[in-house]
Curated annotation (Swiss-Prot):
It is found in: Cell membrane. Residues 98-294 form the VWFA domain. Keywords: Cell membrane, Membrane, Transmembrane, Transmembrane helix. This is UPF0353 protein Mvan_2751. It comes from the Bacteria. Coiled coil: none annotated. Belongs to the UPF0353 family. It comes from Mycolicibacterium vanbaalenii (strain DSM 7251 / JCM 13017 / BCRC 16820 / KCTC 9966 / NRRL B-24157 / PYR-1) (Mycobacterium vanbaalenii).
Amino acid sequence: MTLPLLGPMSLSGFEHPWFFLFFLVVLGLVALYVIVQMGRHRRMLRFANMELLESVAPKRPSRWRHLPAVLLILSLMSFTVAMAGPTHDVRIPRNRAVVMLVIDVSQSMRATDVAPNRLVAAQEAAKQFADQLTPGINLGLIAYAGTATVLVSPTTNREATKAAIDKLQLADRTATGEGIFTALQAVATVGAVIGGGDEPPPARIVLMSDGKETVPSNPDNPKGAYTAARTAKDQGVPISTVSFGTPYGYVEINDQRQPVPVDDEMLKKIADLSGGDAFTASSLEQLKQVFTNLQEQIGYETIKGDASVGWLRIGSLVLALAALGALLINRRLPN
Protein backbone atom coordinates (compact mmCIF):
# COMPACT_ATOMS: atom_id res chain seq x y z
CA MET A 1 0.00 0.00 0.00
CA THR A 2 0.98 3.63 -0.42
CA LEU A 3 0.19 6.19 2.28
CA PRO A 4 -0.02 9.92 1.54
CA LEU A 5 3.21 11.78 2.42
CA LEU A 6 4.84 8.55 3.61
CA GLY A 7 5.16 6.55 0.41
CA PRO A 8 4.95 2.80 -0.31
CA MET A 9 4.84 0.36 2.61
CA SER A 10 4.69 -3.41 2.67
CA LEU A 11 5.20 -6.35 5.00
CA SER A 12 6.08 -8.89 2.33
CA GLY A 13 8.66 -9.70 -0.32
CA PHE A 14 11.65 -8.95 1.93
CA GLU A 15 14.97 -8.90 0.05
CA HIS A 16 17.19 -8.92 3.17
CA PRO A 17 15.20 -10.81 5.83
CA TRP A 18 18.29 -11.47 7.97
CA PHE A 19 18.05 -7.85 9.15
CA PHE A 20 15.15 -9.01 11.33
CA LEU A 21 17.84 -10.35 13.67
CA PHE A 22 18.18 -6.74 14.76
CA PHE A 23 14.91 -7.27 16.61
CA LEU A 24 17.01 -9.18 19.17
CA VAL A 25 18.91 -5.97 19.85
CA VAL A 26 15.61 -4.14 20.24
CA LEU A 27 14.36 -6.78 22.68
CA GLY A 28 17.63 -6.43 24.59
CA LEU A 29 17.10 -2.69 24.90
CA VAL A 30 13.56 -3.27 26.18
CA ALA A 31 14.84 -5.71 28.78
CA LEU A 32 17.60 -3.30 29.83
CA TYR A 33 15.09 -0.47 30.20
CA VAL A 34 12.83 -2.62 32.40
CA ILE A 35 15.78 -3.65 34.58
CA VAL A 36 16.91 -0.05 35.01
CA GLN A 37 13.41 1.06 35.99
CA MET A 38 13.06 -1.76 38.52
CA GLY A 39 16.43 -0.86 40.05
CA ARG A 40 15.39 2.78 40.26
CA HIS A 41 12.24 1.79 42.11
CA ARG A 42 14.19 -0.34 44.62
CA ARG A 43 16.63 2.49 45.33
CA MET A 44 13.72 4.81 46.09
CA LEU A 45 12.23 2.30 48.53
CA ARG A 46 15.56 2.16 50.43
CA PHE A 47 15.35 5.88 51.14
CA ALA A 48 14.41 5.97 54.84
CA ASN A 49 12.64 9.31 55.01
CA MET A 50 10.13 9.38 52.11
CA GLU A 51 8.71 12.73 53.26
CA LEU A 52 12.16 14.31 53.06
CA LEU A 53 12.69 12.72 49.62
CA GLU A 54 9.47 14.18 48.29
CA SER A 55 10.37 17.61 49.66
CA VAL A 56 13.81 17.80 48.06
CA ALA A 57 13.20 15.84 44.85
CA PRO A 58 11.25 17.14 41.90
CA LYS A 59 7.66 16.08 41.55
CA ARG A 60 7.50 12.39 40.78
CA PRO A 61 6.95 11.94 37.05
CA SER A 62 3.85 10.14 35.86
CA ARG A 63 3.72 7.07 33.67
CA TRP A 64 4.13 9.38 30.69
CA ARG A 65 7.86 9.33 31.44
CA HIS A 66 7.99 5.98 29.63
CA LEU A 67 6.60 7.43 26.40
CA PRO A 68 9.97 8.54 24.92
CA ALA A 69 11.40 5.06 25.48
CA VAL A 70 8.36 3.42 23.88
CA LEU A 71 8.62 5.74 20.87
CA LEU A 72 12.33 5.01 20.55
CA ILE A 73 11.65 1.27 20.50
CA LEU A 74 8.93 1.72 17.87
CA SER A 75 11.25 3.79 15.69
CA LEU A 76 13.94 1.11 15.89
CA MET A 77 11.38 -1.52 14.89
CA SER A 78 10.34 0.59 11.91
CA PHE A 79 13.97 1.03 10.85
CA THR A 80 14.48 -2.74 11.14
CA VAL A 81 11.58 -3.45 8.79
CA ALA A 82 12.99 -0.90 6.34
CA MET A 83 16.45 -2.51 6.43
CA ALA A 84 14.90 -5.90 5.66
CA GLY A 85 13.96 -4.52 2.24
CA PRO A 86 10.19 -4.96 1.85
CA THR A 87 8.85 -4.87 -1.71
CA HIS A 88 5.47 -4.40 -3.35
CA ASP A 89 4.01 -4.99 -6.79
CA VAL A 90 4.38 -2.05 -9.19
CA ARG A 91 2.68 -1.86 -12.58
CA ILE A 92 4.80 -0.14 -15.20
CA PRO A 93 4.21 0.39 -18.92
CA ARG A 94 5.90 -2.09 -21.20
CA ASN A 95 8.53 -0.49 -23.41
CA ARG A 96 9.70 -3.64 -25.13
CA ALA A 97 6.93 -5.92 -26.39
CA VAL A 98 5.22 -7.04 -29.59
CA VAL A 99 1.48 -7.39 -30.12
CA MET A 100 0.03 -8.80 -33.33
CA LEU A 101 -3.60 -7.89 -33.94
CA VAL A 102 -5.07 -10.61 -36.17
CA ILE A 103 -8.53 -9.80 -37.56
CA ASP A 104 -10.91 -12.14 -39.39
CA VAL A 105 -12.23 -10.50 -42.59
CA SER A 106 -14.22 -13.45 -43.90
CA GLN A 107 -17.68 -12.89 -45.41
CA SER A 108 -19.39 -13.75 -42.13
CA MET A 109 -18.15 -10.41 -40.80
CA ARG A 110 -20.88 -8.81 -42.94
CA ALA A 111 -23.49 -10.02 -40.46
CA THR A 112 -25.54 -7.19 -38.98
CA ASP A 113 -26.34 -8.80 -35.63
CA VAL A 114 -23.89 -6.22 -34.30
CA ALA A 115 -24.68 -2.79 -35.72
CA PRO A 116 -23.81 -1.60 -38.26
CA ASN A 117 -22.07 -4.92 -38.99
CA ARG A 118 -19.42 -7.07 -37.37
CA LEU A 119 -16.52 -5.74 -39.42
CA VAL A 120 -17.27 -2.05 -38.90
CA ALA A 121 -17.71 -2.58 -35.17
CA ALA A 122 -14.47 -4.54 -35.07
CA GLN A 123 -12.65 -1.74 -36.88
CA GLU A 124 -13.84 0.85 -34.38
CA ALA A 125 -12.86 -1.25 -31.37
CA ALA A 126 -9.48 -2.16 -32.89
CA LYS A 127 -8.64 1.50 -33.47
CA GLN A 128 -9.54 2.27 -29.87
CA PHE A 129 -7.21 -0.55 -28.80
CA ALA A 130 -4.40 0.95 -30.89
CA ASP A 131 -4.93 4.35 -29.28
CA GLN A 132 -4.99 2.98 -25.74
CA LEU A 133 -2.01 0.64 -26.03
CA THR A 134 1.07 1.95 -24.22
CA PRO A 135 3.38 3.86 -26.61
CA GLY A 136 6.42 1.60 -26.24
CA ILE A 137 4.69 -1.52 -27.57
CA ASN A 138 5.19 -2.51 -31.20
CA LEU A 139 1.76 -3.21 -32.70
CA GLY A 140 1.30 -5.13 -35.95
CA LEU A 141 -1.82 -5.91 -38.00
CA ILE A 142 -2.78 -9.04 -39.93
CA ALA A 143 -6.00 -9.59 -41.86
CA TYR A 144 -7.03 -13.09 -42.82
CA ALA A 145 -9.78 -14.85 -44.72
CA GLY A 146 -8.73 -17.64 -47.12
CA THR A 147 -5.15 -16.36 -46.76
CA ALA A 148 -3.38 -14.10 -44.28
CA THR A 149 -1.67 -10.81 -45.06
CA VAL A 150 0.60 -8.67 -42.92
CA LEU A 151 -0.88 -5.20 -43.40
CA VAL A 152 1.39 -3.47 -40.87
CA SER A 153 4.60 -4.91 -39.48
CA PRO A 154 5.02 -4.35 -35.72
CA THR A 155 5.61 -0.66 -35.13
CA THR A 156 5.01 2.05 -32.57
CA ASN A 157 3.38 4.17 -35.28
CA ARG A 158 -0.28 3.91 -34.29
CA GLU A 159 -1.50 6.07 -37.17
CA ALA A 160 -0.22 3.56 -39.71
CA THR A 161 -2.03 0.75 -37.92
CA LYS A 162 -5.30 2.68 -37.69
CA ALA A 163 -5.13 3.65 -41.36
CA ALA A 164 -4.74 -0.02 -42.29
CA ILE A 165 -7.65 -0.99 -40.04
CA ASP A 166 -9.87 1.46 -41.90
CA LYS A 167 -9.01 -0.25 -45.21
CA LEU A 168 -9.91 -3.81 -44.23
CA GLN A 169 -11.77 -5.64 -47.01
CA LEU A 170 -13.94 -8.76 -46.81
CA ALA A 171 -12.90 -11.96 -48.59
CA ASP A 172 -13.97 -15.61 -48.84
CA ARG A 173 -13.21 -18.49 -46.46
CA THR A 174 -11.59 -18.52 -43.02
CA ALA A 175 -8.02 -19.76 -42.53
CA THR A 176 -7.51 -19.05 -38.84
CA GLY A 177 -4.43 -21.26 -38.58
CA GLU A 178 -2.68 -19.39 -41.37
CA GLY A 179 -3.44 -16.10 -39.62
CA ILE A 180 -1.77 -17.38 -36.44
CA PHE A 181 1.26 -18.81 -38.26
CA THR A 182 1.72 -15.51 -40.12
CA ALA A 183 1.59 -13.63 -36.82
CA LEU A 184 4.22 -15.93 -35.30
CA GLN A 185 6.52 -15.31 -38.24
CA ALA A 186 6.10 -11.55 -37.85
CA VAL A 187 6.84 -11.81 -34.13
CA ALA A 188 10.03 -13.77 -34.80
CA THR A 189 11.18 -11.28 -37.42
CA VAL A 190 10.65 -8.17 -35.32
CA GLY A 191 12.10 -9.90 -32.24
CA ALA A 192 15.40 -10.36 -34.06
CA VAL A 193 15.38 -6.69 -35.07
CA ILE A 194 14.39 -5.18 -31.72
CA GLY A 195 16.82 -7.16 -29.56
CA GLY A 196 17.81 -5.08 -26.56
CA GLY A 197 18.01 -7.94 -24.10
CA ASP A 198 19.15 -11.48 -23.39
CA GLU A 199 15.78 -12.81 -24.54
CA PRO A 200 13.35 -11.88 -27.33
CA PRO A 201 10.80 -9.23 -26.38
CA PRO A 202 7.57 -10.58 -24.87
CA ALA A 203 4.92 -11.08 -27.52
CA ARG A 204 1.21 -11.76 -27.73
CA ILE A 205 -1.31 -12.40 -30.47
CA VAL A 206 -4.78 -10.86 -30.22
CA LEU A 207 -7.04 -12.92 -32.49
CA MET A 208 -10.43 -11.48 -33.33
CA SER A 209 -12.90 -13.68 -35.17
CA ASP A 210 -16.58 -14.49 -35.30
CA GLY A 211 -16.67 -18.00 -36.64
CA LYS A 212 -15.33 -21.43 -37.27
CA GLU A 213 -12.24 -22.12 -39.33
CA THR A 214 -13.14 -23.41 -42.81
CA VAL A 215 -9.65 -23.84 -44.31
CA PRO A 216 -8.54 -26.49 -43.49
CA SER A 217 -11.69 -28.28 -42.39
CA ASN A 218 -9.84 -30.02 -39.55
CA PRO A 219 -8.19 -27.54 -37.13
CA ASP A 220 -5.72 -30.25 -36.09
CA ASN A 221 -4.25 -30.42 -39.60
CA PRO A 222 -0.66 -29.15 -39.99
CA LYS A 223 -1.95 -25.71 -41.04
CA GLY A 224 -5.01 -25.77 -38.80
CA ALA A 225 -5.89 -23.40 -35.98
CA TYR A 226 -5.24 -25.87 -33.15
CA THR A 227 -1.85 -26.82 -34.57
CA ALA A 228 -0.97 -23.14 -34.85
CA ALA A 229 -2.08 -22.57 -31.25
CA ARG A 230 0.18 -25.37 -30.03
CA THR A 231 3.06 -23.87 -31.99
CA ALA A 232 2.39 -20.49 -30.37
CA LYS A 233 2.53 -22.19 -26.97
CA ASP A 234 5.89 -23.76 -27.84
CA GLN A 235 7.24 -20.36 -28.90
CA GLY A 236 6.00 -18.63 -25.75
CA VAL A 237 3.47 -16.45 -27.57
CA PRO A 238 0.05 -16.65 -25.89
CA ILE A 239 -3.05 -15.93 -27.96
CA SER A 240 -5.86 -13.80 -26.57
CA THR A 241 -8.97 -14.65 -28.58
CA VAL A 242 -11.97 -12.37 -28.94
CA SER A 243 -15.08 -14.10 -30.27
CA PHE A 244 -17.36 -11.42 -31.64
CA GLY A 245 -21.01 -11.77 -32.63
CA THR A 246 -24.22 -13.52 -31.58
CA PRO A 247 -25.74 -16.96 -32.22
CA TYR A 248 -28.29 -15.29 -34.50
CA GLY A 249 -26.02 -13.72 -37.11
CA TYR A 250 -26.61 -14.36 -40.80
CA VAL A 251 -25.50 -13.12 -44.21
CA GLU A 252 -27.26 -13.01 -47.58
CA ILE A 253 -25.58 -15.19 -50.24
CA ASN A 254 -27.30 -15.43 -53.64
CA ASP A 255 -30.52 -14.20 -52.05
CA GLN A 256 -30.30 -16.99 -49.52
CA ARG A 257 -30.00 -16.37 -45.79
CA GLN A 258 -26.94 -18.18 -44.46
CA PRO A 259 -26.61 -18.48 -40.65
CA VAL A 260 -23.19 -17.45 -39.30
CA PRO A 261 -23.39 -17.97 -35.53
CA VAL A 262 -20.38 -16.98 -33.49
CA ASP A 263 -18.14 -19.92 -32.57
CA ASP A 264 -17.01 -19.27 -29.00
CA GLU A 265 -15.91 -22.87 -28.42
CA MET A 266 -13.22 -22.99 -31.10
CA LEU A 267 -11.74 -19.64 -30.13
CA LYS A 268 -11.66 -20.63 -26.47
CA LYS A 269 -9.78 -23.82 -27.32
CA ILE A 270 -7.27 -21.83 -29.37
CA ALA A 271 -6.66 -19.59 -26.36
CA ASP A 272 -6.36 -22.55 -24.00
CA LEU A 273 -3.93 -24.44 -26.24
CA SER A 274 -1.69 -21.38 -26.54
CA GLY A 275 -1.75 -20.45 -22.86
CA GLY A 276 -3.77 -17.29 -23.49
CA ASP A 277 -7.17 -15.96 -22.49
CA ALA A 278 -10.54 -16.11 -24.24
CA PHE A 279 -12.96 -13.18 -24.36
CA THR A 280 -16.45 -12.87 -25.81
CA ALA A 281 -18.44 -9.86 -27.00
CA SER A 282 -21.87 -9.60 -28.57
CA SER A 283 -22.05 -5.83 -28.94
CA LEU A 284 -19.78 -2.93 -29.81
CA GLU A 285 -19.70 -1.70 -26.22
CA GLN A 286 -18.74 -5.14 -24.94
CA LEU A 287 -16.05 -5.37 -27.60
CA LYS A 288 -14.60 -2.01 -26.58
CA GLN A 289 -14.54 -3.15 -22.96
CA VAL A 290 -12.75 -6.35 -23.94
CA PHE A 291 -10.07 -4.35 -25.74
CA THR A 292 -9.75 -2.00 -22.77
CA ASN A 293 -9.16 -5.02 -20.52
CA LEU A 294 -6.65 -6.41 -22.99
CA GLN A 295 -4.79 -3.12 -23.06
CA GLU A 296 -4.51 -3.17 -19.27
CA GLN A 297 -3.29 -6.76 -19.39
CA ILE A 298 -0.85 -6.41 -22.28
CA GLY A 299 0.34 -2.83 -21.92
CA TYR A 300 1.73 -3.17 -18.41
CA GLU A 301 3.96 -5.52 -16.50
CA THR A 302 4.20 -6.07 -12.78
CA ILE A 303 7.59 -5.81 -11.12
CA LYS A 304 8.84 -5.73 -7.54
CA GLY A 305 9.36 -2.20 -6.26
CA ASP A 306 11.00 -0.88 -3.09
CA ALA A 307 8.55 -0.45 -0.21
CA SER A 308 10.97 0.62 2.53
CA VAL A 309 10.56 4.39 2.11
CA GLY A 310 7.39 4.54 4.17
CA TRP A 311 8.98 2.62 7.04
CA LEU A 312 12.03 4.91 7.01
CA ARG A 313 9.85 8.00 7.16
CA ILE A 314 7.68 6.61 9.94
CA GLY A 315 10.78 5.62 11.89
CA SER A 316 12.26 9.09 11.49
CA LEU A 317 9.02 10.76 12.55
CA VAL A 318 8.61 8.55 15.62
CA LEU A 319 12.28 9.08 16.56
CA ALA A 320 11.77 12.84 16.41
CA LEU A 321 8.70 12.51 18.64
CA ALA A 322 10.74 10.43 21.08
CA ALA A 323 13.38 13.16 21.32
CA LEU A 324 10.72 15.84 21.78
CA GLY A 325 8.98 13.76 24.44
CA ALA A 326 12.23 13.27 26.32
CA LEU A 327 12.74 17.04 26.44
CA LEU A 328 9.19 17.89 27.52
CA ILE A 329 8.25 15.02 29.81
CA ASN A 330 11.46 14.15 31.61
CA ARG A 331 12.94 17.60 32.13
CA ARG A 332 14.19 18.25 35.64
CA LEU A 333 14.19 22.03 35.88
CA PRO A 334 10.98 23.73 37.08
CA ASN A 335 9.31 26.38 34.91
